[in-house]
Amino acid sequence: SNAVEGLLNYRFSKRIKEQKTKLRMVIDWFENQVVDKGWNAGFNKFYPDIPTIGCRGYIPSLQYLCSYPSKIEYNSGILPATISVIGKGFIDSTREFAAILNVENSPAFRFKHLWNESTAKPDSNYFTILVALSIISEESFNILNLVNEYLKTIDSNNMRFWVKPHPAMSEKELRNGFDNKWPEEFFIIQGLSSEYIPRSDIMISGMSSICLESMSLGVPVIVVENLRGLSYNPIPEEVPQDLWRPCRTPNDIENEVEYYQNRSDEEINRHKEIGLKIREDYFEPVTKEGVRNFLMLDLP
């Protein structure tokens, strides 16, 4: 269980201290779960003089409360000395329950591709909708069913639907799990999402970090909400709703697709500017200087 793993992490730091292992710094993939608490409690006790960093290298949902540390946790010594986030826009929200926390901006390693220069753009012969599915099967099939129902109400001759399954789901599992006959308009794509986002006009997805990625490239997102539980919205509250819309029904999808499909060139350019601001605020570029600062290495 996680509790046992947390204890093992604690004892790991104790054992390597007993072996007189010298450490310069400690970095933990930080979600502030039990395993992290054991890890940080151990290194704070047995290596009190070295820097400990909790690397929050992901986009936290507002409902993923464990990733927002409390002052009690800080006072209990179970947090890293520094929490690194992937963009300056995440700093204030990370301190929501403990203003005393040392939170620093660091390179967004997993999202380095967002800063790669690309000439890719949507095919003007189609209106391309990228349907990005979740790791949660139930959520993925709910998204597909809604899009399929929407598909029945429109003329889709000039529309193209790219269905991108989560890497944890095979194409066979996707087709077999879909209740209805697989629509011929649905094209399953493989490979990296980053290859398809710039070539899409809009994206339809669920509660996934790919939503903020898409918006940062100026590609609008229709976010399908969860009707059977909490909706883990991955979009920070500070992000304007210009580039995203929540939806629950096929009619919602129809309305929002129509809105984004009929944007003027001026509106599209304005949305790209908003996307650049999102990228600057929430995805710190990976640079040599940024990496050396993160690793506390002396700059040349």
Pin down the residues of each PLM region.
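Catalytic binding pocket for nucleotide-activated donors in carbohydrate/polymer assembly enzymes
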Residues: 97-105, 180, 209-281
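Donor nucleotide-activated moiety binding/catalytic core segment of transferases
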Residues: 168-217
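Structural motif
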Residues: 24-25, 128, 160, 201-202
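Conserved catalytic-core segment of nucleotide-activated headgroup transferases in glycan assembly
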Residues: 104-179
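Short, charged/polar "capping" segments at the starts of alpha-helices
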Residues: 35-36, 61-64, 90-94, 113-115, ...
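C-terminal alpha-helical cap of glycosyltransferases
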Residues: 281-300
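Short, well-ordered beta-strand core segments
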Residues: 52, 83, 203-204, 221
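Active-site and donor-binding regions of nucleotide-sugar-utilizing enzymes
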Residues: 1-112, 210-211
